[in-house]
Every structure is written in C-alpha cells, then in structure tokens.
Amino acid sequence: MINWKVELSYIGKDFWGFQKQPGKRTVQGELEKVLKLLFDEDIKVIGAGRTDAGVHALGQVVNFKTKESKNFSCDKLYKVLNKLLPGDIKIKKVEIVDDNFHARYSAKRRWYIYVIYNNEEKNLFLRDYCWWINKPLDKDLLNLSANLFKGIHDFRNFCVIENYDNTNVEIYESFWYFKEDLLIYFVSAPFFLRKMVRFIVGSMVEVGLKKKELEDLEKYLKDRKEERFSSPAPASGLYLFKIDY
C-alpha cells in the first residue's frame, strides 16, 4: 500500500463541511470521487480537521492509501488533481509518507484563524470570507480576552456538546493581529471541540463591543454554566490555517 499525504486549501461557502455526508457536497466527497477515477478503487480520505459547513481551509492535510501508484509521481498527481478537482479546491503539496502516518492522529497542533472586517461600510467582496461587524470593537479588550483562553480550560461552555469524554483543551497560542479594518484572531491547540473557535470568537466580540464584561468571560471559563456566554461567530470568517506534525 502507498500512503499519500496531501496539503490543500478550499473555499468553504459551497460545501457542507469537510466530512462526507449522503446527498451533500463535501470536500471529502469531491476528493474521493476524483481519486476513485484516477486509481480505479474505492479510497477513504482522512482529514486532519473536520471543518463545518461554510468554513474555509488554507492548510488542510489529508492522507489516503492506494494499492498501487498507477505510475503517478507526487508531481504528476499534484497536477492531475488540480486539473480535475472543482475550482474551490486547490492542492498545495503531494508527498508519499510512512505507512503509519495518519493525518488526524499524527497531528501535534492545529491552527485556526478567524477574520473580522470591522468597518461601518460593508464590503461585498469580503462577505463570504469574514464576519462583518459595523460597530467599533475595542482592540485592547479583544487582546485581554484572547489572553484569558491560553492554557488548559474546560471548554464545555464554548462548544457544541457531543459525546466527549473530556472537554478540557490546552490552548497553546491565542492572539489578535490587527491590520487596518481587518482583525485576525490566531489560535492553536492539539485539538478543538466542535464549533469551539467560533464560540471563543463570539464571546470575545461580546466583550469587544462592551456588551459583556471581561470579568464575566473569565468566570465562564472557570465555572460550568447552563446558558451560553454568546452565540458562535459565523462560519464565513473561520479558516483552518495549518497543521503541525
């Protein structure tokens, strides 16, 4: 068996997420459809991050195994995949890796970014790629909020609850980068719970708009609550940035 590792990017707005779903257009589904055509076998694609509907990726990583190479070099497969895949998926790199490499379980750190366009006037060309907020955000409060999330916390109040054995997550990096009207949040961790980054961003925006207090956000991180601190931020601003192995 040959184990292929592929790095790719995609625009998430017309996908029902990464993971294959019956009757839905997904990134995994598009990849597997083209790979079956090329290798003449059913192939299961494994993704490092299972992005939700509308979420983009700049550095998603997948792996899949084939019985034979079908005379595909890494360079040739890179070119053919980019030719056959739809225009909202771009292959960035193709490698052959050790048999034990697993895109999801071998990952050491996942990075996400979230993009906010903070301007009174809307920008139609950014609409599907960010969260437009037309009221001014307090950047100092955003920075202070981001610092609260560093370290190990129970994120039960900041995710969609599924059958998780453990909702404790260690956040390695949590910071904002500001460039004029673009406010970009960077966050990294070994893994994330479902919609966790979007709930984190939504909560920071509540503080940044001065709708809620920074001290209240700190309490939510320490104590389990029945109600949410905020709604999740829209999917359009979220990007799977890169995966560290």
UniProtKB/Swiss-Prot annotation:
It is an enzyme of class 5 (isomerase). GO terms for biological process: tRNA pseudouridine synthesis. The active site is at D52. GO terms for molecular function: RNA binding; tRNA pseudouridine(38-40) synthase activity. Transmembrane segments: none annotated. Keywords: Isomerase, tRNA processing. InterPro entries: PsdUridine_synth_cat_dom_sf (IPR020103), PsdUridine_synth_TruA (IPR001406), PsdUridine_synth_TruA_a/b_dom (IPR020097), PsdUridine_synth_TruA_C (IPR020095), TruA/RsuA/RluB/E/F_N (IPR020094). Its EC number is 5.4.99.12. SUPFAM superfamilies: Pseudouridine synthase (SSF55120). Substrate binds at Y112. It catalyses: uridine(38/39/40) in tRNA = pseudouridine(38/39/40) in tRNA. Pfam families: PseudoU_synth_1. NCBIfam families: hisT_truA (TIGR00071). HAMAP family: TruA. Belongs to the tRNA pseudouridine synthase TruA family. Homodimer. PANTHER family: PSEUDOURIDYLATE SYNTHASE, TRNA PSEUDOURIDINE SYNTHASE-LIKE 1. Formation of pseudouridine at positions 38, 39 and 40 in the anticodon stem and loop of transfer RNAs. This is tRNA pseudouridine synthase A. It comes from Dictyoglomus thermophilum (strain ATCC 35947 / DSM 3960 / H-6-12). The gene is truA.
